[in-house]
Amino acid sequence: SPQGVSSAASDVYKRQAQMSGVDFSPASLAEARTLARRCNTPIDYHESDVFLAAEVLPQGNFDLVYTGIGALCWLPSIERWAQTVGALLKPGGRLFIREGHPMLWAINEDHHDSLRVELPYFETREPLVWDDENTYVETDSPLKATMTHEWNHGLGEIISALLAQGLDITGLVEHQSIPWEALPGQMVVDERGEWRLKEAPWRLPLSYTLQAVKRGG
């Protein structure tokens, strides 16, 4: 989301980077611009579906595309996302992802005493539909729109989609931690402020970091 990117982007800006961001929500963009000003970080934001980002941003012009954690689950097609990434990057440009692991998304979090794979690991045509009043954003106001639609994408599907768009994978690390309590009742906070399984954390990857470079640079 732009909110998350704004707070992280100040470090990138210190390296004299020119940054752009895309989101389909006018409200999210307004908040993102406020945070960017607060961080004294100029970011060129555009209101657009991420699949249309290559139509509102200059194609083949970016040195780095960053996809933040918790973004891919909102996208129905990982191939279309990879097409967008490939269209935006210049030859030699890099993609960086920190994302929740698809194995984690396949675990049913309603079981607070066990790990049960009960949800799709691979991309499906139809989304998972949730009706939930909870949000990761701190707010005192009740949510009016509580229905969400999500898709999982297997790690192989993600890698294959990027390879098909002319990117080479340069790094892939699976992590035993994630920034939020993804499995309530089964996690503890570690010394870095991230959450991990309190019992036998080696059982399940919770997130991953992927880096790739567009061929031709």
Question: Positions of the model-derived regions?
Answer:
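Conserved SAM-binding strand-loop segment of SAM-dependent methyltransferases
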Residues: R38-A53
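A short SAM/SAH-binding and catalytic strip from SAM-dependent methyltransferases
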Residues: D63-E79
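Conserved class I S-adenosyl-L-methionine
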Residues: R94-Y136
